[in-house]
Amino acid sequence: EIPLIEEAAKAGCEYFCIDAGWYAKGFWWDAVGEWKESRERFPNGLKEVTDYIRSKGMIPGIWLEPEVMGINCELAKTLPDTWFFVRHGKRIYDRSRYQLDYRNPEVREYMTSVVDRLIQEYGIGYIKMDYNIEPGIGTEYDAESPGEGMLEHERAYLQWLDALFEKYPELVIENCSSGGLRIDYAMLSRYSIQSTSDEEDYRYYATIAANSPSGLTPEQSAVWSYPLPEGDREATVFNMVNAMLLRIHQSGRLDKISEEEKDLVKEGLDCYKSIRGDINKALPFWPLGLSAFDDEWTALGLGTEEKLYLSVWRRSGNTPCISIPIPQGKGKEAEVICRYPSFNTSTYEWNQVAGTLSVNFERENMARFYEIKLCKEN
């Protein structure tokens, strides 16, 4: 973790989240549930790492899956069935995990104690809450139907979240849910951030990123940016543009990429920080329509009263040029600048009469981020 922490700090990251596996030395999938650090993995303790994250000016975060216990979790073997979803008199499990029942106050108290320990002992300020099972139709225990048991569990879980945020108002909690599931506003009215996908091909992620504001607010839409050691500078730019108008989840082997790519990551994060104050008050628009995975060109815009921001991607095909309609700009003069990357040499031109921005991307898998200031009509 140390090399990644150092490079993340240099790039300008503000949080550093330790992902799954911190509680086990090896295979852990079916044994989760106690949420205690693995001394084999962290011989000097997890606190050594979280303290180091703090020393680099970042807030430490951690991965947690608070609604499940593995079937081989030692604690689960000692607990009564009232802690879990039950059907036909037996605990139900999916993918080798039991579903915890948050109607039970002991469950809520236990998971609150886990969060308390992570915050108070390790200084955790960010929790990536995952959820990787399908609990089925619900639980029959103490319910007239499985559906009633499910509904009351969900309500109890939301109340638990409310209590956490009341207790720790500065805590940031991400709704990961297996990479973009459970995107509903019962959840999103509480969670700080929503994962949009676990897509591992950054070229496809452009479509997910561009469409995400159709389902959730841009400032909650967490999008991965993960430049690869085998990539080039355009691949790094593509990654950064994917997340620029949303919520950047910076990832990738920042310790393995070239110095030029590191500089581009830092430049991208600096650019994002300079515009993120506008994101939560801007309205999204899709000048090329919603995106499909086989589209050659994709665009996402955010508009405020003062300016427009526009991310443009060329993914494939033999068409190096496109004119992007900006309806609110028709008949208006405009000042257009490429905000990212600073090395940009690809041409672009504003057409006042048509209200279009024409761009020329000389290769596939290119992306650019523009700022458009429309002049007020006389």
List the model feature ranges, each with a label.
Residues E1-T78, W83-F84, E109-S113, E152-D162:
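Aromatic- and glycine-enriched glycan-recognition loops and surfaces
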Residues F16, I53, D130, I173, ...:
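Hydrophobic, well-ordered secondary-structure elements that form the walls
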Residues D19, G61-E65, K128-D130, E174-C176, ...:
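A cross-family glycoside hydrolase active-site/sugar-binding cleft signature
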Residues R41-G45, V49, S55, L79-V237, ...:
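Active-site neighborhood of glycoside hydrolase catalytic domains
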Residues N242-R247, S251-L288:
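Aromatic- and carboxylate-lined catalytic core of secreted/periplasmic carbohydrate-active enzymes
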Residues G289-K330, A367-E371:
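Carbohydrate-binding surface patches
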Residues P327-F343:
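Solvent-exposed beta-hairpin/edge-strand motifs
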Residues S346-N378:
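C-terminal beta-strand-rich structural cap/linker in extracellular carbohydrate-active enzymes
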